[in-house]
Swiss-Prot record:
GO molecular function: aspartate-tRNA ligase activity; aspartate-tRNA(Asn) ligase activity; ATP binding; nucleic acid binding
Any single GO BP term: aspartyl-tRNA aminoacylation
Taxonomic lineage from the root: Bacteria, Pseudomonadati, Campylobacterota, Epsilonproteobacteria, Campylobacterales
Keywords: Aminoacyl-tRNA synthetase, ATP-binding, Cytoplasm, Ligase, Nucleotide-binding, Protein biosynthesis
EC class (word): ligase
Cited InterPro entries: Aa-tRNA-synt_II, aa-tRNA-synth_II, aa-tRNA-synth_II/BPL/LPL, Asp-tRNA-ligase_1, Asp-tRNA-ligase_1_N, Asp/Asn-tRNA-synth_IIb, AspRS_core, GAD-like_sf
Gene: aspS
This protein's record includes keyword Nucleotide-binding: yes
Task of the protein: Aspartyl-tRNA synthetase with relaxed tRNA specificity since it is able to aspartylate not only its cognate tRNA(Asp) but also tRNA(Asn). Reaction proceeds in two steps: L-aspartate is first activated by ATP to form Asp-AMP and then transferred to the acceptor end of tRNA(Asp/Asn).
Name of this protein: Aspartate--tRNA(Asp/Asn) ligase
PANTHER family, per database record: ASPARTATE--TRNA LIGASE, MITOCHONDRIAL (PTHR22594:SF5), ASPARTYL/LYSYL-TRNA SYNTHETASE (PTHR22594)
Residues reported in the UniProt entry to bind ATP: R219, D220, E221, Q228, E477, G529, L530, D531, R532
Amino acid sequence: MRSHYNTDLGISHVGQSVKLCGWVNSYRDHGGVIFIDLRDRSGIIQLVCDPNDSKEAHEIASNARNEFVLITEGTIRPRGEGLVNPKLKTGEIEVVVSKLTIENESAVPPFAIADESVNEELRLKYRFLDLRNPKLYENFALRSKACIAARNSLANMGFLEVETPILTKATPEGARDYLVPSRVHQGEFYALPQSPQLFKQLLMCSGFDRYFQIAKCFRDEDLRADRQPEFTQIDVEMSFCEQKDVIKVAETFLKDIFKACGKEIQTPFRQMQYKDAMENYGSDKPDLRFDLKFIDVIDIFTKSNNEIFANIAKDTKKNRIKAIRVPKGDTIFSKRQMQRFEEFVRKFGAQGLAFIQVKKDGLKGPLCKFFSEEDLNELSKRCELEVGDVVFFGAGAKKTVLDYMGRFRIFLANELKLIDPNALEFLWVVDFPMFEQNDDGSYSAMHHPFTMPKNIDETDLEEISSIAYDVVLNGVELGGGSIRIHKNDIQQKVFKLLNIDEEQQKEKFGFLLDALSFGAPPHGGIAIGLDRLIMLVTGANSIREVIAFPKTQRAQCLMTDAPSPASNEAMRELGIKLRENIK
């Protein structure tokens, strides 16, 4: 029906006859000559409907309105002098229309396509209109290229694409499951998979050796800008491997994905232990596009005359005192900014934000009076302070200090405009703890309970580490993986440490324990969040910009009005009756 997409055309096509299809983006009547901006998925081109060229086409054009569907034929000509539009890919040319057809009319649209001021909820309600925006289309074109590149890259490395079940058994993986009632087995439920984790391990037990899948996953959790109830991941598993083998495979297909998206990245990525990431950056996914690394000064504060700081410094296992040096910060930050910094960290549990300024005549600030001159010199040397600098201090319980100082580090970087938006800083964070303590004192697996521990016989659960690894890009966790437990006795021991008794093990994981009893090979893998990856590549503000039909932050689809009530008949067939107070 068409000869070209709009942006396929340029100055080299002048004089050529074309046939184009698309929507009216806008129209203007200039003294009898009608100009129409025709939009297709690639972008916009200008149509010129002049009665001197075609009276019939001009008459039809006079009836066109925004979002009408047009089919047009005409000839490419260069725009007149001074009329070139550098904002358009086709800004040097226009189409002189000889034939025009209104293929379909449109109701008055609730907003102009590509109007960035439109409320997001309105855009999501009319998502089919929102997706007509060529900028959004470019996101999905890039997503398609990324998926094709991932498939080709993994296939070239000997991986087999295998689909795993969507209707499966509920297993504890950290978030709530979406449950699906069974009509045939009333009172029983399937769960939608939070990941293909157990099935891909079973495929390794089956001898498939190398598996991948671009998998849809489901988690019923609180939503944020980078979370959705259903999301997609590039899921990979391989047998007879070590951590370094999985990392090499992941770097290979990530490099191929970025190349397909027009970006070159360097491999291998740098690596950092989890402990170092937390102690130096206050995050297990540090953004390395800028410095502002923590400086450990707790030993110096043991000599302080300030009772609060001195008491904190006595317990180096439970407490931390960290410093962040900002070069020339004393010459940059106003008194009001310093107040804002303290207000910011207080939101995350800080009792305050101490600081020292470096003046020409020495160190200044309320803290200075609590140190001897020798200790101040040691502090200055440790922090490599220079005239004009300011150094901030966070002190208190380890978890709280690392958290708010990590957040403050990012806040400072944004204030100082230190972040290069075009930089791509990849990082592997390795050697994660096997377990983490919950607020109630119990322990849970930091990644998942199928991760291979390094020192399972250690009596202190917090000292057990795991063969787990996360890949981070610009401070965002792209994905994570681990070497898995492939021996039945070790898996049962991990379950026991998590207070999962033998009866629960058999009920929830009996099939996995059976598989591990029949000669399971060493295996490991990784999963990369496709939505987050494309969000970072495109520079989108939210993964909702790279998912065709996303949910809101309340897990609703405003376009289809899902979720919605089921009919009484459907509920009867499923054997389900709602409580009376459920609306």
